[in-house]
Design a protein with these regions (language model features):
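Iron-sulfur cluster-binding cysteine motifs and their immediate structural context
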Residues: 217, 223-245, 249-251, 255-272
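A generic structural signal for alpha-helix starts
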Residues: 23-26, 105, 223, 251
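FMN-binding flavodoxin-like domain, especially the glycine-rich phosphate-binding loop
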Residues: 2-18, 25-31, 37-50, 56-69, ...
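A mid-sequence, solvent-exposed acidic-amphipathic segment
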Residues: 190-224, 230
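A short, structure-level motif marking secondary-structure boundaries and short turns
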Residues: 98-100, 212-214, 241
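A generic structured-segment signal
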Residues: 20-21, 232
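Conserved short-loop catalytic and cofactor-binding motifs
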Residues: 68, 102, 159, 219-220, ...
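Active-site-proximal loop/hinge segments that shape catalytic or ion-binding/gating pockets
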Residues: 277-285
């Protein structure tokens, strides 16, 4: 399982430094790992926590809370929003909280929406009633992985490398801010019309495009390797050739599409002539 290295909790735990993260094609996982290794934070994989129904965590007095996730349709992914609505942080009292989103070009108002989700969960309020808010916010540009709209494609290899090298340099700066618990730092690439991206296009995206009904597999090409079901973060794929369960849990991360070694999976017809991407696919990204 792609998330097998992340240690899960069997009971309520006292955490020291924690990053909750979700990643579909590996960009956000790599970013979260760079931060965790640099500051000694523990990575908690959101899909694993959802599988195990583990939502309650005890905070230490000086706990630092971090969230890392990709931008999906200029909004936080469905799976991240579902997790936040169930998260319980015992002892939350003005703890330093930061959040980072990865995106192909810009992220619109994804962080505004994310903070609204935090504020709406009363289980995240402090003892005096103040909501948990991510005060320090970052976006990191990473290689594009969304390919289901006419104007969106994967990046050429040279642009992939350029984005990752830029991200690597940016992360040194981000890590120093997190280490020092600097509040109120906002470094976001929102784009030219962020409200249009998130509240109009993004709303349509989440209503119409976040679905498994458009996925299909070419049975003549499928090698029955089972990779697609292994990488699905919501366990929405069974069997070989794969069958999508249509259970409403698909978060449209496109992991099944991108990780298929023979390009047997497609989303409608638009991806048939599109390339695939996941982090370190060719072994040249570390």
């Amino acid at each position: 399982m792609i998330y097998s290295k992340i240690r899960l909790f069997t009971t309520l735990k006292f955490l020291t430094y924690t990053i909750f993260y979700f990643s579909g094609t590996g960009n956000t996982r790599w970013v979260a790992q760079q931060i965790a290794e640099a500051i000694g934070e523990e990575l908690l994989c959101i899909p694993d926590l959802l599988r195990e129904k583990r939502f309650e965590f005890k905070l230490e007095e000086n706990e630092k809370i971090g969230f890392c996730f990709p931008t999906h349709g200029w909004q936080p992914p469905r799976i991240v929003r579902q997790f936040i609505r169930q998260l319980i942080l015992v002892g939350q009292h003005s703890h330093f909280c930061w959040a980072l989103t990865t995106c192909g070009d810009n992220m619109g108002e994804a962080m505004t929406i994310f903070n609204k989700e935090l504020a709406a969960n009363k289980a995240l309020q402090s003892e005096n009633g103040n909501p948990l808010q991510a005060e320090t916010l970052f976006s990191v540009i990473m290689p594009e992985s969304y390919v289901c709209l006419p104007f969106m494609k994967t990046d050429p290899i040279d642009k992939e490398h350029w984005k990752i090298e830029n991200a690597r340099h940016q992360l040194h700066h981000i890590i120093s801010i997190i280490k020092d618990c600097k509040r109120g730092i906002v470094e976001l690439e929102k784009g030219v019309t962020p409200r249009l991206y998130s509240y109009v296009i993004g709303a349509y995206f989440n209503k119409k495009m976040v679905t498994d009904k458009k996925f299909s597999v070419d049975a003549d090409i499928c090698t029955h390797c089972g990779k697609c079901s292994k990488v699905c973060p919501v366990d929405n794929i069974k069997g070989t050739p794969p069958t999508w369960l249509h259970n409403g849990r698909c978060t449209c991360c496109l992991a099944c599409y991108h990780y298929c070694p023979v390009h047997a999976i497609n989303y409608g017809s638009i991806t048939r002539k599109r390339d695939q991407y996941y982090f370190n696919r060719r072994g040249d990204q570390k």
